[in-house]
Amino acid sequence: MTGKLPLVFCALAALLTGCASVQPTRFYTMSPATAPAATAPAVYSLSVGPVWVPAAVDRPQIVVQTGPNQVLIAEFDRWAEPLKEAIPRVVVENLSLMLGAQDIAIFPQSGSADASYRITIDILRFESLPGKAAIVDARWTVRSTKDEKTGSGRAKITETVRAEGYPELVAAHSRALEQVSGQIARTVRDMAGSKP
């Protein structure tokens, strides 16, 4: 028994050393556009949502593409909020800025039922390629609650990641969502009959 005691202590020491070197978890959030605001405020209200996100990326951890059919779940690099909430939040802030819309809500918050236009978004791809690109492939529908007319579109955006690391990858996703938001804003303007 005394011969096994040093082995037990060595195993315990190795375990404690492993526990002491646990990597800290980092949290990331996407940001809205920094583009100039619309020149004239919108006279209509908007509701954004629901937003559908692929199940493979619908998790707290950032999911990165490591090959054509392979992903890595980054255990210590996480979204600060679920993507199903982050994407509509960023799109709402972008549309508010781009269209001058002050009356804009995220579905199903109060006020969203009375919106002039309802926007639903289906994120078909939300891919993260660290050091390379952020890819957002989105399809949307804008529906007028006044006359039930609809407009739709699709954007396939590949935004270059400017440097290594997760902060740059998340910034690239923010820029990709800015481009998607710009195309959604164009659809809303076309339906509202206003000029860009």
Name what the model sees in each region.
Residues M1-V8:
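Bacterial N-terminal signal peptides that target proteins for export
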Residues L15-G18:
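C-terminal motif of bacterial Sec signal peptides marking the signal peptidase cleavage site
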Residues A20-K84, M191-P196:
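A structural "domain/chain start" motif
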Residues P54, R89-A101, Q183, T187-S194:
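Structured segments of extracytoplasmic/periplasmic soluble domains
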